[in-house]
Regions:
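Domain-terminus/edge residues, biased toward the C-terminal soluble/receptor-binding domains
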Residues: 8-210
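Short, small-residue-biased leader/transition segments that mark boundaries at the very start
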Residues: 3-4
């Protein structure tokens, strides 16, 4: 039957939630990332052409699975994951055209090209980085009735690691302390939890410091 429904919509975010939940199922991972499947004497290749070396324009050695789909209205779509050097990314490309690119004589399914470009950018441009190190001082708070000091340092309980752009200038990162008390009553013990902090980059909270 006709799969097109006028009010049938979804988003890349919706697809990511469904896919991430499905990837928790070992059988789903096994079958959705199988490059080809033998069935009754036939070899059935995965419809994601990024998995097949023979398709030079599309092939991406780090790609795995997951799902492709196309209709006249939705054009070309792909959900694919890639793993490299300990990093794992999920690319979801929707409503991508089929067209000639770079003076080619044939039509290119741009969903695969776009997903490949996204992965190449992510692996080259993003890095897992320690933004705040364990025991790093991020502020201070006054202490009432203290014997040796009027203030104590607020330090991070653990390392806080986040994926950020390569070469990030840490001055662009804002550490915003949350619910800081006006003062503490002595005695204050080492390791005592006082408050937390948000790490903000580009007007977005990217992590929290306990």
């Amino acid at each position: 039957g006709d799969v097109y429904k006028r009010q049938h919509y979804t988003t890349a975010r919706d697809m990511s939630k469904i896919t991430l939940a499905a990837l928790k199922n070992a059988n789903f991972v096994k079958y959705s990332t199988t490059t080809e499947y033998e069935y009754k004497g036939y070899t059935l290749p995965h419809t994601n052409l990024m998995l097949h070396p023979g398709y030079v324009t599309y092939y991406y050695e780090y790609a795995q699975g997951i799902k492709t789909g196309s209709t006249e209205q939705a054009e070309y779509n792909v959900i694919v994951k890639a793993s490299k050097d300990g990093y794992n990314y999920l690319a979801i490309v929707m409503k991508s055209p089929q067209q000639k690119i770079k003076n080619q004589s044939y039509l290119t399914k741009c969903s695969f090209v776009d997903a490949k470009s996204l992965f190449e950018w992510a692996f080259d441009s993003l890095k897992y980085t320690t933004i705040v190190a364990k025991d790093e001082v991020i502020g201070e708070v006054s202490v009432e009735n203290g014997k040796d000091a009027d203030t104590v340092a607020l330090v991070a309980a653990n390392d806080t690691n986040v994926i950020v752009p390569v070469g990030l200038d840490k001055s662009a990162v804002i550490i915003e302390i949350q619910e800081k008390p006006s003062s503490l009553q002595a005695p204050v013990t080492k390791g005592q939890k006082v408050c937390s902090a948000n790490i903000i980059y580009g007007d977005e909270v990217i992590a929290s410091v306990p």
